[in-house]
Amino acid sequence: MSSFSDALWLGVQYAFFFVLAGVARSSFVFRLADRPLFWALLLGGLSGQWQPALSLGIVVELLWLDVIALGSVVPPFGTLAFLLLFPLSIIPGWSEAHQFLAPLMFAVFAAYGASYAERYQRVALNPLVDLVTAWFTSGRGCTPGQAVALGTVVRAAWQFSLYMLCYVALWLACDLLGEAIFLFEGQMGWPVLLAASMVGGILSLRTRRAYACLTGMFVAVCGFLAVTRLDMF
């Protein structure tokens, strides 16, 4: 793989994309930018890596089909999963489905972790409502504009930090494991991975039980793959 400095600089650029996706996620003006396929089309055009961009975008999009918000559970960050995976098509230049399988599992858990982090971040920002209320009643506290600005800065900071943490962890794992991270080499193509991603039909229910079902499935698959790899050695 390329040097750590090159990979880190690429990660910083994609962290800013993730921040922009977060802004779109919390607005009603341009919600399309919160969808993985939007970033697949945009970054595929900018980089020229159309094949991995569209393939990854469709896979991640199918994992979360719940375009319409239903239920009270904070939806996972599908854009985080895509923006973690796509740089691997640039550094180190992967393009085959089996190369992305193990990183995809990590990216899915990262997307769910980000949704839980967002929930706690929303709770942490709740005191801003009291400050705005105090400003209206007594003139003390902060104005609505100040509250929005502070909330935006806090949100951007935690999204940037979260992306860089996940990106560095994924890049180091890929760098240390090398080709050992490739699963089912020569046995899995993009059509198989696209079919497997149809599990998004479960996630579209957006209930805790559906999420627990997916988590259990991934744990079972990871356990099976771990045993298979051990048997190979």
Where do the model's predicted regions map?
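Helix-loop-helix junctions within the multi-pass membrane cores of secondary transporters/permeases
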Residues: 100-182, 194-196
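Central hydrophobic cores of alpha-helical transmembrane segments
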Residues: 56-60, 81-83, 212-224
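Helix-coil boundary and interhelical linker segments in multi-pass alpha-helical membrane proteins
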Residues: 1-12, 43-54, 88-106, 176-179, ...
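Juxtamembrane boundary at the C-terminal end of a transmembrane helix
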Residues: 222-233
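Short helix-perturbing small/polar motifs within transmembrane alpha-helices
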Residues: 14-22, 65-68, 80-126
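Alpha-helical transmembrane segments and their immediate juxtamembrane interface regions
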Residues: 179-219
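Hydrophobic alpha-helical transmembrane segments
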Residues: 21-23, 44-48, 64-67, 89-93, ...
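Hydrophobic transmembrane alpha-helices
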Residues: 2-75, 79-80
